[in-house]
Curated annotation (Swiss-Prot):
GO terms for molecular function: N-acyl homoserine lactone synthase activity. It holds the Pfam family Autoind_synth. This is Acyl-homoserine-lactone synthase. It comes from Dickeya dadantii (strain 3937) (Erwinia chrysanthemi (strain 3937)). Gene3D superfamilies: 3.40.630.30. The gene is expI. InterPro entries: Acyl_CoA_acyltransferase (IPR016181), Autoind_synth_CS (IPR018311), Autoind_synthase (IPR001690). Transmembrane segments: none annotated.
Amino acid sequence: MLEIFDVSFSLMSNNKLDEVFALRKGTFKDRLDWTVNCINGMEFDEYDNEHTTYLLGVKEGKIICSVRFIEMKYPNMITGTFFSYFDGLNIPEGNYIESSRFFVDRDRVRNLIGTRNPACLTLFLAMINYARKYHYDGILTIVSHPMLTLLKRSGWRISIIQQGLSEKQEKIYLLHLPTDDESRYALIERITRITNAESEQLTTLPLLVPLA
C-alpha cells in the first residue's frame, strides 16, 4: 500500500523532517546538482517553516516521495528565489498555493515498489486532491524543462504562464497546475492501469493506493 497524506511543518517530527531533508539532498544536490544549501547531509531552506505543508508518500514506513506547499500570500520560491530569473514575473491573482521541492526517491521506489510504479502519478493526483480539499483556485510552480515534459505526459492539463532562465542559463517555466475534473480523472485512469486501485478510492486525501 502506498499512502500519501498532508502534514504541516509544525506537526512534523524531527525524525521525519530530517528524513525529508536528507532525501531532498539526494535528489536536488547529488543527482540534479542544483544550487541548494546543504548542512549535515540535508537540504532545507528558509521556506521550510510554519507556513509550509508537505505531502508525504510513504511505503512500509519509509518516505518515498514528497512535495512542499506554501500559500502565495506567504514568502515562497516564486516571489523570492526564482523572481529574478524572469523578466517581469506575471503572477496570477487568486487563492493559489505554490508547490516546490517535488521529488520521488528513485532508489527507495525501486527497492520498495519496483520499476513499474505509480509514485509520481499518485503524487501529482494527491496535489490536485489537496488543492480541492482546501478550496484553492489551483497550484503555481516553477519547473525545469524535464519536469515540464513529465507533467505534460501525465495527462495533467497544465499551462505555461511564463518562461525564464535559471542561474545555469537553462529554461525554466512558471506553470499553472489546474484542479479540474479532466486532469484529475486523466491521472486516475493512468494510476488504475498499474495498481489495484478503484477510481473512487483515488479522489480523497489521505490517498491510499493498493499496489498491483
